[in-house]
């Protein structure tokens, strides 16, 4: 079963991206480098 998750910037705390994941295959939190428009650079985004 896929669930919707928000990706939150680790620097400024803004929620910039909405994605989905299969909780059965990936029970751990997702960490992805993405562009943060508030910081104007690529930062680590963590599942919130």
Curated annotation (Swiss-Prot):
Gene name as annotated: rpmG
Organism: Streptococcus mutans serotype c (strain ATCC 700610 / UA159)
Coiled coil: none
UniProt keywords, alphabetically: Ribonucleoprotein, Ribosomal protein
Domain of life: Bacteria
Family that this chain belongs to: Belongs to the bacterial ribosomal protein bL33 family.
Any one Gene Ontology cellular component term annotated for this protein: ribonucleoprotein complex
A biological-process GO annotation: translation
Name recorded for this polypeptide: Large ribosomal subunit protein bL33
Lineage start: Bacteria, Bacillati, Bacillota, Bacilli, Lactobacillales
GO MF term list: structural constituent of ribosome
Matches recorded under HAMAP family: Ribosomal_bL33
